[in-house]
Amino acid sequence: MQTSVTPDAISTVLSNPSFDSSSDRSEIVVQVVDLKPIGNRYTFSANDGKTKVKAMFTASLTPEIISGKIQNLGLIRLIDFTVNDISSKSTKYFLVTKCEAVGSVLDSEINLDSKSGEEEAREPKKQKLEHSPVSPLNDVVSTGITLKPKQEFVAKSASQIMSEQRGNAAPAARMAMTRRVHPLVSLNPYQGNWTIKVRVTNKGVMRNYKNARGEGCVFNVELTDEEGTQIQATMFNDAARKFFDRFQLGKVYYISRGSLKLANKQFKTVQNDYEMTLNENSEVEEASSEEMFIPETKFNFVPIEELGLYVNQKELIDLIGVVQSVSPTMSIRRRTDNEMIPKRDITLADESRKTVVVSLWNDLATGIGQELLDMADQSPVIAIKSLKVGDFQGVSLSTISRSNVVINPESPEAKKLKSWFDSEGKEISMSSIGSGMSPSAKNGSRSLYTDRVLLSHITSNPSLFEEKPVFFSTRAYISFIKPDQTMWYQACKTCNKKVTEALDSGYWCEGCQRKYEECSLRYIMAVKVTDSSGETWISSFNDEAEKILGCSADELNKLKSEEGEVNEYQTKLKEATWSSHVFRVSVTQNEYNGEKRQRVTVKGVAPLDFAAETRLLLQDISNKNKTSQ
């Protein structure tokens, strides 16, 4: 049976910023001091004889306390716990998720820093009696550990404890203490009476709407409880106006008298099957005295190299990265109402050696965006909550009304990323995640990771493409490039439109309405592609053809005109065959001499990225497993 604490255990843990209880298996035995209930949990002070730190047991350990296995002044061995920061204070606390009682309850609090027996003997008797009302012999033990006198303990009923807590609590908290605090994970639409204690980890803007039922306003907040569970709460009209100013980002509240329903996946911003609605009769009270035990904003970071999987999806993502550059603010005219709105682009990088452009809009562009511009030379780390992934330049990110930006967050991910960048990242050449993906345009092009199909899906469904162009991505081999086809056309160097030879000399451009002495050649090439399901001919224009052949049309024309034993022109075409690419294509139907023909046109092409393809296959397997279950 353990009879002593681990000396200096707490100071050792607090001095190690990267401490991980799951990997550091050194034994840590502390004494439980000042054990008291907070909602459905218990807080205490962990004492190692020299240092004390605030701590909390998770709800899973509450039965151990109720059964008496863990008691006040008892000794416990910490098996699994985390060290968290207390909001708005420069102190920390332990969140204990697993422990075991290792000794019987001691008479008093352990104090290794107390005076020795000889020093204490010199103290006046009156002072000694004041500090030792029970027995002087209990003050000093042979090990040098001094025990503070055991406090008088009187058994109290639950109603007495709750009554005392309500009497000492601030008026704002008394409402919440009349009911049991429920964890978010336990809520469902069929409960009618609950109280939750949550932190506002994200707050949206007040938005006005107009529909067939009338006009109104709405705003929402993201709430997080002690377990780290999140839920989105939405308020309309009177409730929105009532609670918009009351809810402050980062503060903790008791909330009751709300309702739950299944979350709309189209608008869901957190990982929860339910969403909450608060009306004007809901109760919201601030719980400022206990905010330290509610975690800050919870992020689920996506590495930059994996962003392609989220392009044009409804799911919002969180991102962390090192700031590489910050642009000045620019004004963009919104199409819906012609209003000018501010925008600022920042470029972020992470350990995948990839970069991505994030567009900050509205207040984020002028507020935090300006802060980032002022400190860009310091390469700060930023974490962004709720980003929309688009396909501009392959992959692009944009903030929305509920997005939240944190500069230099105090998190393990941020510290690790900053350490990597300072030690090696700033010397490494980065590449854009969008390179190798087709740019966005009005023709409907998207990321090469979306709408992936086999060639047979395109060739065997001609009726799908009768009304308008349909876009797909496909992975295929180039099997043949016909050498005697018309490979290019003569183009204007200014506008790229077709030119005709002038009567005297030079070239005439209808687009520019002027004559030029020279022109350039631009590809208009047909290639046959093949995969495991079939084959088809596709049309490729200049930019995509250059990627396929590895040279410009002018360079290929020069090879074609050269004479020699080896036909360099045909050799160049053969080199491009039987290489695998990912194509973004549009499929349309054209009518020629009364016959409908399918036309497949390349909109984007990229070499095979084996890492990205592997992730895509794993995602497909995961989706199929979920469907079959």
UniProtKB/Swiss-Prot annotation:
Zinc fingers (C4-type) by residue: 492-512
Record-linked InterPro entries: Euk_RPA1_DBD_C, NA-bd_OB-fold, Rep_factor-A_C, Rep_factor-A_N, REPA_OB_2, Rfa1, RFA1B/D_OB_1st
Region forming the signal peptide: none
DNA-binding region: 194-280
Subcellular location(s) of the protein: Nucleus
One GO biological process term: DNA recombination
Regions of compositional bias (Basic and acidic residues) in chain numbering: 115-131
Molecular function GO terms recorded: ATP binding; DNA binding; helicase activity; hydrolase activity; zinc ion binding
Gene3D superfamilies: Nucleic acid-binding proteins
Region ranges (Disordered): 112-135
Alphabetical list of Pfam families matching this protein: DUF223 (PF02721), Rep-A_N (PF04057), Rep_fac-A_C (PF08646), REPA_OB_2 (PF16900)
Role noted for this protein: Component of the replication protein A complex (RPA) required for DNA recombination, repair and replication. The activity of RPA is mediated by single-stranded DNA binding and protein interactions. Probably involved in repair of double-strand DNA breaks (DSBs) induced by genotoxic stresses.
Summary of subunit composition and partner proteins: Heterotrimer of RPA1, RPA2 and RPA3 (canonical replication protein A complex).
Family note: Belongs to the replication factor A protein 1 family.
The protein's name: Replication protein A 70 kDa DNA-binding subunit D
Annotated organism of origin: Arabidopsis thaliana (Mouse-ear cress)
Taxon lineage: Eukaryota, Viridiplantae, Streptophyta, Embryophyta, Tracheophyta
Gene, per the UniProt record: RPA1D
